[in-house]
A protein has these predicted regions:
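Membrane-embedded transport module
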Residues: 1-6, 21, 28-198
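Cytosolic catalytic headpiece
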Residues: 1-13, 19-22, 64, 86, ...
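Alpha-helical segments flanking ligand/cofactor-binding loops in enzyme cores
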Residues: 15-16, 32
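Juxtamembrane/interfacial segments flanking transmembrane helices
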Residues: 120-123, 192-202, 229-239, 272
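Hydrophobic alpha-helical transmembrane segments in multi-pass integral membrane proteins
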Residues: 154-158, 217-235
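Hydrophobic mid-bilayer segments of alpha-helices in multi-pass membrane transport proteins
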Residues: 178-181, 212-217, 255
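Alpha-helical transmembrane segments
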Residues: 186-190, 225, 262-270
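Cytoplasmic-side transmembrane-helix entry/capping segments in multi-pass membrane proteins
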Residues: 202-211
Length: 277
C-alpha cells in the first residue's frame, strides 16, 4: 500500500515490529529492548502523546500546503498577466520591482502568515497519504487554477476596461492602483486557503500573526504608494523605483472592493465542489 506505518508497544517480542516500522514508538516504562528498537520513546507512557505528535505533524504539512496554494495563485497570475499583457496593448503592468516585491515580501511574510495556523482536530480524520502521493492533489490544483484564473480575468478587466480607466487621472495612477489591487487580491486569497471549507475566518484569534502580517503588508503598500508625497529625495526615489504615484481614496476603495471578490469566488467553488460530491 506504500503507506507510512507507525508501531507502538513495550515488550521484548515487540522489538522486531518496532524496528521494521517507519516510526517505532516505544513506551518509556517498556523493556530496554523495546526502547532500543524504537525511534521515539514516549516518556509519559500516554497514547495521547502519539496522537498529539501525529496531529502537529499533519498541521505542519497542511500549513505548507496552504502556503503553496497561496503562493502558486500569485505566481500563475503574475506570469500570465506579464506574458499576455502586451497582446492587449498593455506594457509592463507589473514592473520588475513589483514582481520582486510580490515574490520576496509576499513569500517571506506569507510563510509567517500561514505557517502558524493552529492545529485542527479535523486533520485526524484525513485518510493516510501514500509515499508516492503528489503534494498537489487534484482538489488543490483545482483551487489554484480557479483562483489564478479569476485573478487573471480581474487583472485584464481592470487594465483594459474604460470604466476603470476613467476612475484615475492617468495611466501611471491606474498602473499603481493595479499593483495595489494585485497585492490586496493575493492577501484576500490568504483567507481562502486557511480552510478547505467555508470557515475561512475561523480561529483567526489563534493565529494573531496572520492579521498582523496582513495589515503590515497593507501599510507597506501605503508607504510605497504615498512615498512621492514626502518633501525629500527619498520619497521621490522610492516612487521612481516602484514606478508608483499617489492615488486618491476612491482608488483605494475600488482596489479593496475588487480584491474582495476573491472571497465569494472561492466560496462559490467550494459550494460547487460540495454540491457535486
Amino acid at each position: 500500500m506504500n503507506l507510512v506505518v507507525g508501531m507502538t508497544w513495550d515488550g521484548v517480542n515487540d522489538s522486531p515490529a518496532l524496528r521494521r516500522a517507519d516510526v517505532g514508538f516505544a513506551m518509556g516504562s517498556g523493556t530496554e529492548a523495546a526502547r532500543d528498537a524504537g525511534d521515539i520513546v514516549i516518556l509519559d507512557d500516554n497514547f495521547r502523546s502519539i496522537k498529539d505528535a501525529i496531529l502537529y505533524g499533519r498541521t505542519i504539512y497542511n500549513n505548507i500546503l496552504k502556503f503553496c496554494r497561496f503562493q502558486l495563485v500569485i505566481n500563475i497570475a503574475a506570469v500570465v498577466v506579464s506574458a499576455f499583457a502586451p497582446f492587449f496593448g498593455i506594457m509592463e503592468p507589473l514592473r520588475v520591482t513589483h514582481l520582486l516585491f510580490i515574490n520576496l515580501v509576499m513569500d517571506s511574510l506569507g510563510a509567517i502568515m500561514l505557517g502558524n495556523e493552529p492545529a485542527h482536530e479535523s486533520y485526524m480524520h484525513e485518510k493516510p497519504r501514500r509515499r508516492d502521493a503528489s503534494i498537489i492533489s487534484p482538489a488543490m490544483a483545482a483551487q489554484i487554477l480557479w483562483m489564478g484564473t479569476w485573478l487573471v480575468l480581474l487583472s485584464f478587466a481592470f487594465l483594459t476596461q474604460p470604466i476603470f480607466a476613467a476612475c484615475f487621472a492617468g495611466q501611471a495612477e491606474q498602473y499603481t492602483a493595479y499593483f495595489l489591487l494585485f497585492v490586496l487580491a493575493s492577501l484576500m486569497n490568504g483567507f481562502n486557503v486557511r480552510s478547505s471549507g467555508f470557515g475561512i475566518f475561523r480561529d483567526l484569534g489563534a493565529n494573531p500573526g496572520f492579521l498582523r502580517v496582513w495589515g503590515g503588508i497593507v501599510l507597506i503598500m501605503a508607504a510605497i504608494i504615498n512615498a512621492p508625497l514626502l518633501p525629500n529625495e527619498i520619497g521621490a526615489w522610492i516612487g521612481a523605483m516602484f514606478s508608483c504615484t499617489p492615488i486618491h481614496p476612491g482608488g483605494w476603495v475600488l482596489a479593496f472592493l475588487l480584491a474582495a471578490t476573491m472571497l465569494p469566488v472561492d466560496l462559490l467553488r467550494k459550494a460547487l465542489v460540495r454540491a457535486l460530491r
